[in-house]
């Protein structure tokens, strides 16, 4: 959504960074209804993202310098939502947040059932000490989120 893609164009132009996204979400980069720029109207003017350079699927590897992150397909917030798993860390985007928060599923393509499957089947299957870095808010751990989500 716009809160995660609004800087794609200037960042890519300034640095040569490639735009990577879960395969099923690639159309949303260019569709103002799916990425919510249309809903924001004037607030989103000039925030259009370029298309994807890299389409990611489960098991792909993404490198940031010497850091290797594995793609976990964690649909629910969007059909192509991904989390990135590294050694002792996971970047969860809008799938889970600290203190038991979970991603919204009321936007186009969202699915509560898929989100819960992603959380229970993939993220909560990780070791308790795995550090969680969500797309919004403070970091947490899988163990802490497992406790919060079980309430």
Residue spans of the language-model regions?
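Active-site HxH/HxHxD metal-binding segment of metal-dependent hydrolases
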Residues: 1-62, 147-151
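Metallo-beta-lactamase
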Residues: 35-40, 61, 67-151
